[in-house]
Amino acid sequence: MRFKKGNRWKNSGGQLRYKTWRKNVFELNKRKIGLSRHYVCIKCNKKRKTTRVLHAHHIFSWDKFKNKRYDKSNGVVLCWKCHNGFHRKYKFEALDNPSLLIEYLGKKGNLVKEYINNDR
């Protein structure tokens, strides 16, 4: 699912900030998992040496939670298959409801709960 961000996105430096956020989410994922050479999907545990087939997914929606957009803790790493599976299952309900991500991740949802609890 892609959102058109338009000129507001381009003119605000959003592309660079987003790329930096994405990179930081991947690096934080590696540290939390304890790996130095691989990136891991939080849902299915598939390891990848590159981020090409992995997605950084916002816990709190990019669109609705502007103050959390570029917070590196506001992201989890999902492989393409798991990321699309999440959005197919929950569609737009998930945009402002992080508890759906926790439900989708099952036991791994504790990492998301940890972020939400630390944010309060």
Predicted region positions:
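Short Cys/His-centered divalent metal-binding micro-motifs
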Residues: 49, 75-96
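Short linker/helix segments within small regulatory modules
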Residues: 60-74
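Canonical RING-type zinc finger of E3 ubiquitin-protein ligases
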Residues: 50-56
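Short, charged surface segments at domain edges that flank catalytic/cofactor-binding sites
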Residues: 5-43, 67-69
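Short cysteine/histidine-rich metal-coordination sites, predominantly Zn2+-binding motifs
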Residues: 58-64, 94-103
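Charged phosphate-binding loop/patch that engages nucleotide di/tri-phosphates or the phosphate backbone
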Residues: 97-120
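The −1 position to Zn-ligating cysteines in a subset of zinc-ribbon hairpins
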Residues: 40, 55, 78
